[in-house]
Amino acid sequence: MALLRALLGLLACTPRPSAAYFGLTGNEALTILPLTSEMEEAAVKAHYKVCDRLKLEKKQRRMCRRDPGGAETLMEAISMSALECQYQFRFERWNCTLEGRYRASLLKRGFKETAFLYAISSAGLTHAMAKACSAGRMERCTCDEAPDLENREAWQWGGCGDNLKYSNKFVKEFLGRKPNKDLRARVDFHNNLVGMKVIKAGVETTCKCHGVSGSCTVRTCWRQLSPFHEIGKQLKQKYETSLKVGSTTNEATGEGDISPPKKSIPGHSDQIPRTTDLVYIDDSPSFCLMSRYSPGTSGRKCYKDKNCDSICCGRGHNTQSRVVTRPCQCQVRWCCYVECKQCTQREEVYTCKD
């Protein structure tokens, strides 16, 4: 699969000393590292090796090493973030291209696409860590054991909740503290926090009733995170409404703040960004033609009545006809399988012209 080839490709980014980075915005290779028999036989040594293969900063590597489940959770976060990013942008000119040279160039600029990468990476790590705690894969955390619910006396806290409290603490420490002066570093930090806040806002309480004939005299309740696909959907919406910002100085603290650009720019809002808004510094390129930021859209598959005009950037599209075989007229047979016929049909495939 093209996606797996992208994830298995190695990446070398230029290190940035201003803050800690991870996932789709980090220095590590976008690699899905398999759990081998060697890892099962020598778990501690193996997880140290994985932490070393993820090109982390010194503090991040130490945090990865201190829990046997850390490396697996970090890899899961990277994979989950990459898959969701490519899913959310599958119909866009920039389709979350993660090949090394394109991603490295993109991360050097403060585009709105870069903002999304920071948010989805921090969200992925927050989500993966909270789930790892509740699944018992981490030694330093367990289930969410501190319910703060109304009418607690009527509820029995017996479910295994996702441990967002520990996850937030871990991610904040892992990604580093808020920088004071550099605008780009502050913007990246802000977008990291947006990803974490979307995770927190999506926490739901799930309950199961116990009692005679379903009377629900006792309820077992626990907290669960929203599915990560829902998180990705919300972050994509925030990408669509992201705000361009500049830099100002807070007279009370002397520290820099992010704010709307000093001069009004046509097409951009002067709205002061909220803590839940994605923000960016630089206007994005069109992504129509091959550049340092993307391979362009030449040859990209599109959908005639949906996005060919947009993705192909006015160059038009080619039409090819092909015959495909698909399961059809499926029926459930007792017991217990589905029986289908194989039907052939002709379909048209549309790709962008050069």
From Swiss-Prot:
Is Nucleotide-binding a UniProt keyword of this protein?
Answer: no
**Cysteines paired by S-S bonds:** C85-C96, C133-C141, C143-C160, C207-C221, C209-C216, C288-C313, C302-C308, C312-C352, C328-C343, C330-C340, C335-C336
Database matches in InterPro entries? Wnt, Wnt9a, Wnt_C, Wnt_CS
Q: Cite the entry's keywords alphabetically.
A: Developmental protein, Disulfide bond, Extracellular matrix, Glycoprotein, Lipoprotein, Secreted, Signal, Wnt signaling pathway
Q: Where does the record place the region Disordered? A: 246-271
> Single GO cellular component annotation?
extracellular space
Compartments annotated for it: namely: Secreted, Extracellular space, Extracellular matrix; Secreted
GO BP annotations, alphabetical order: canonical Wnt signaling pathway; cell fate commitment; cornea development in camera-type eye; embryonic skeletal joint development; iris morphogenesis; negative regulation of chondrocyte differentiation; neuron differentiation; positive regulation of embryonic skeletal joint development
Which family does this protein fall into? Belongs to the Wnt family.
Q: Explain the purpose of this protein.
A: Ligand for members of the frizzled family of seven transmembrane receptors. Functions in the canonical Wnt/beta-catenin signaling pathway. Plays a role in embryonic chondrocyte maturation and in embryonic bone mineralization.
Q: What is this protein called?
A: Protein Wnt-9a
